[in-house]
Design a protein with these regions (language model features):
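Basic, glycine-rich polyanion-binding accessory segments appended to enzymes
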Residues: 224, 232-319, 323-324
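Short, glycine-/aromatic-enriched active-site segment of Class I SAM-dependent methyltransferases
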Residues: 134
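Conserved small/polar residues in nucleotide/adenosyl-binding loops
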Residues: 325-331
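Anionic-ligand-binding alpha/beta catalytic cores of soluble enzymes and soluble regulatory domains
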Residues: 151-196, 200-257
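Short gly/Ser/Thr-rich phosphate-binding loop of adenylate-forming enzymes
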Residues: 143
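ATP-dependent adenylation/nucleotidyltransferase module used to activate substrates
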Residues: 1-126, 137, 146, 153, ...
Length: 331
């Protein structure tokens, strides 16, 4: 990002954020030295814990499956970067996301998909505000990943050989249950596995060990494959079902962040993405009187998961993004 902006004539300052465990900053520092640009680190551990880690733990213990990266971008990373920019009198924030900032004819800003669909990161950026977008640059989104690595290799930047990040940064081993237990000092309370009719099928280890659509690790014998359909924190039950019961056409979403439009006044066709790895599927958005949206997909979608971000696109840019809170079984 820094190199591309330098080539476009910008004056660049390198900034990294200290958010969780102490990071090895040698690679970032070496890259800045190679580019002959200033480098600084901004501390953000307290803000990160308050805005991301604590809500993540609370959500999981409530039977939700949160999307912490989406929250972190708006409430932590952009906040801290803007603080640095204001202190230094800098006009723009620039990041290395595989996405592009687009100003539409109606004057609103949105995030546009990267030229490389496989690396596109717009899903995680849906929550940015209009103010944040108006002061942000994302030059990497105009290139594919191999081209970016090639550019970095040509001038010997350490990031050229850096592996892609796959996990949530504060749970690198993907063991959410152990992390939550460590954070709270409390074991998750065991309860009942039940079928869709409420019949007890066995004992579960605690809600934090499960997520919607999960099949492995249930410890339940069945003549047909069974999956987690629902987590019920009120009764401490995990509802199990057969594969076909995981599919839904309708989902209800709230906490909406509108990008391409200020709001929706009637039904709108869109492509809905219900998790980061979801390819996206055609749907219609119906505004509700209480300010929420009903998203009705043309075809049933598997394992819509309360707490996850749902992001809706028109053409190649984000229309709006929100949090999924319920889904209705397919007809």
């Amino acid at each position: 990002t820094a190199l591309l902006l330098r080539r476009q004539g910008y004056e660049v300052i390198g900034v990294t954020l200290g958010l969780w465990e102490k990071n090895d900053l040698s690679g970032v520092r070496d890259s800045c030295e190679k580019l002959n640009i200033p480098f600084l680190c901004r501390e953000g551990h307290e803000l990160f814990r308050q805005q991301v880690v604590d809500p993540f733990v609370k959500a999981y213990r409530s039977g939700l499956t949160p999307s912490p990266c989406c929250i972190c971008n708006r409430r932590v990373k952009w906040i801290l970067l803007q603080q640095v920019a204001d202190e230094l009198g800098v006009e723009y924030i620039a990041t290395g996301h595989y996405a592009r900032i687009k100003k539409l004819d109606n004057g609103r800003y949105t995030v546009q998909k990267s030229v490389t669909a496989a690396k596109d990161q717009t899903y995680a950026l849906y929550n940015l505000t209009q103010e944040q977008l108006s002061h942000t640059l994302m030059p990497v989104g105009d290139y594919d990943k191999p081209h970016i690595r090639q550019i970095a290799e040509e001038i010997g930047l350490p990031v050229a050989t850096k592996h892609d990040s796959q996990d949530i940064c504060f749970v690198p081993d993907h063991d959410y249950a152990s992390f939550i237990t460590q954070e709270t000092g409390k074991e998750s309370k065991p309860g009942n596995f039940v079928d869709e009719e409420g019949n007890i099928m066995g004992q579960h280890r605690g809600l934090i060990h499960y997520t919607i659509g999960q099949r492995k690790g249930l410890g339940i014998s069945s003549s047909t494959p069974i999956f987690v359909k629902e987590l019920r924190p009120q009764t401490n039950e995990v509802v199990l079902c057969k594969s076909e019961s995981l599919f839904s056409r309708d989902c209800h979403v709230d906490n909406i962040n509108y990008m391409a439009e200020e709001k929706l006044t009637g039904p709108v066709k869109a492509i809905g993405k219900i998790r980061y790895s979801h390819a996206g599927a055609p749907c219609t958005l119906y505004p509700q009187p209480d300010g929420t949206l009903l998203a009705q997909f043309d075809e049933p979608q598997r394992a819509m998961t309360p707490g996850q971000a749902a992001v809706f696109y028109q053409d190649d840019h984000v229309l709006c993004g929100c949090l999924l809170y319920t889904s209705d079984a397919a007809d």
